[in-house]
């Protein structure tokens, strides 16, 4: 039986599509299998130095002068958006006053812990607890830009070095005069003291009233928020922690 001429298979037209609507692809050619490449791991971000006691200064006096007009203009826009007239007599200077006040409320951005502690760490063979309590604290809630106010209690167990007592209050001032949440503020104070002195332990307790709870939202006038950070023996030894908590309540 005679065979007719062998015909090559008809080529599929370009752009031909499968029944699922996607373009057809040629089958993969055989070859050595390769392990699937793993996506590169994202590089770990280095810790920001601004939280440590040697952190950089986020803002300077020159920044204040340069940014004051823009900040005042922003407050003027806020007044207009509230339905007020920034040009009426009682509000003419309000944008500038508010801008200057906000720079003061956040002046902690202009200082670092190393500025404060430079000459105030002393060698001293004292191995009993040091406590400074009832340090007044004023800060700004970063969520609503309204104040929260209260008191800070600090205790540490020295390790051959002590800190000038007023410097503990200065540490509180630097970190509280920023846009904050109370939990972070409490930890920053404790970590700064730990990094500066390397004591056997540090305990910090913050009690505060938040205007965002008093003036808005649930409007609870007498509520207080209490946060604590315990490091070193204050965290590991229940007796040391209890002694600290008892002394700040006395």
UniProtKB/Swiss-Prot annotation:
GO terms for biological process: dopamine biosynthetic process; neuromuscular process controlling posture; nitric oxide biosynthetic process; positive regulation of heart rate; positive regulation of nitric-oxide synthase activity; pteridine-containing compound biosynthetic process; regulation of blood pressure; regulation of lung blood pressure. The modification Phosphoserine is found at residues 60, 81. Residues 1-64 are annotated as: Disordered. Optimum pH is 7.7 in phosphate buffer. Changing residue 221 to T: In HPABH4B; intermediate phenotype presenting with dystonia and motor delay. Pathway: Cofactor biosynthesis; 7,8-dihydroneopterin triphosphate biosynthesis; 7,8-dihydroneopterin triphosphate from GTP: step 1/1. This is GTP cyclohydrolase 1. It comes from Homo sapiens. The gene is GCH1.
